Amino acid sequence: MKNIAIIGASGYTGAQLTALVHAESELSIQGLYVSENSLDKGRALADLYPVYSHIDLALSPLTEEAKAKIVAEADAVVLATEHSVSLHLAAWFYNQGLAVFDLSGAYRFSDVAQYPKWYGFEHEYPEVLAKAVYGLAEWNAKEVAATKMIAVPGCYPTASLTALKPLKNLLTSAYPVINAVSGVTGAGRKAQLHTSFCEVSLTPYGVLGHRHQPEIATQLGQEVIFTPHLGNFKRGILATITVQLKPGTTTADVAAAYSVYDQAPLVTVKQNQFPKVDDVVLTPNCHLGWKFDENSGYLVVASAIDNLMKGAASQALQCIKIHFNL
């Protein structure tokens, strides 16, 4: 039995992860934590999320005493916190010997020079950053098993990279074009007018400047054009990607490339049949659908995931189970 501490448990991702860990027979929850100044401290998780009424746990403030208790009792800590908060907490818990699974972007880039531009802070822990592994579960399982500092990928990068990485050896120098739509839970639980359900209308945002663009490009090893969109639905991501493949590539070559997922139980691939968000919501699955035009050399692949599950909480759980060989 491995004990897991979850910090940032009051948010959508933290609460979803709590439910997933609670359902695992080989995992237990050491505690649920929020910041000391959170208005949710002391409240039961079920008060915030009645759907989790079967989970009889309260949200504790992350005091110095609580941190010491986590170190003494937990095998791993999951951070569902702001980037600037995870930056410090991840390094502290890692240096105490715990396995850290960080759902923020604070450890996703190996290059410290990326952080001021994309996250607005200087990275203060290059020695910990050097140990971090990008937790794209289907691709980096060996690395996740071997390190105690796991940076869980972003939601858009998970959808995009799952679709693109099998094609790496077939791509030309032309930038893949990624258009992705996410439900409003991707913006978090904090009340904001522009993410209020009655205000949301399908619209692009972060055009040519979203921080997930360099994350995707870094992990793919090739620049991309990435345009996210906010959709008027609660949860889920659909990424539709257009790529140019090398001259002479055949449909059989594409099928062979995607056969890498034949033994991946959470990834489903279909040719000439495209996924729907509703089919992956509340699941840890990724559904891919593709079609290739041999005459033009262009391929369109669509990727559907639940942004709170495969795009966050369930991928963190995948990494936890890989790391502890569960």
From Swiss-Prot:
It is an enzyme of class 1 (oxidoreductase). It holds the Pfam family Semialdhyde_dhC_1. It catalyses: N-acetyl-L-glutamate 5-semialdehyde + phosphate + NADP(+) = N-acetyl-L-glutamyl 5-phosphate + NADPH + H(+). Its EC number is 1.2.1.38. GO terms for cellular component: cytoplasm. One of its GO terms (molecular function) is NADP+ binding. It is found in: Cytoplasm. The keyword Oxidoreductase applies. SMART domains: Semialdhyde_dh (SM00859). InterPro entries: AGPR_AS, AGPR_type-1, NAD(P)-bd_dom_sf, NAGSA_dehydrogenase, Semialdehyde_DH_NAD-bd. The keyword NADP applies. The active site is at residue 155. Pathway: Amino-acid biosynthesis; L-arginine biosynthesis; N(2)-acetyl-L-ornithine from L-glutamate: step 3/4. CDD domains: AGPR_1_C, AGPR_1_N. One of its GO terms (biological process) is L-arginine biosynthetic process. Keywords: Amino-acid biosynthesis, Arginine biosynthesis, Cytoplasm, NADP, Oxidoreductase. Belongs to the NAGSA dehydrogenase family. Type 1 subfamily. Catalyzes the NADPH-dependent reduction of N-acetyl-5-glutamyl phosphate to yield N-acetyl-L-glutamate 5-semialdehyde. NCBIfam families: argC. This is N-acetyl-gamma-glutamyl-phosphate reductase. It comes from Shewanella sp. (strain ANA-3). The gene is argC.
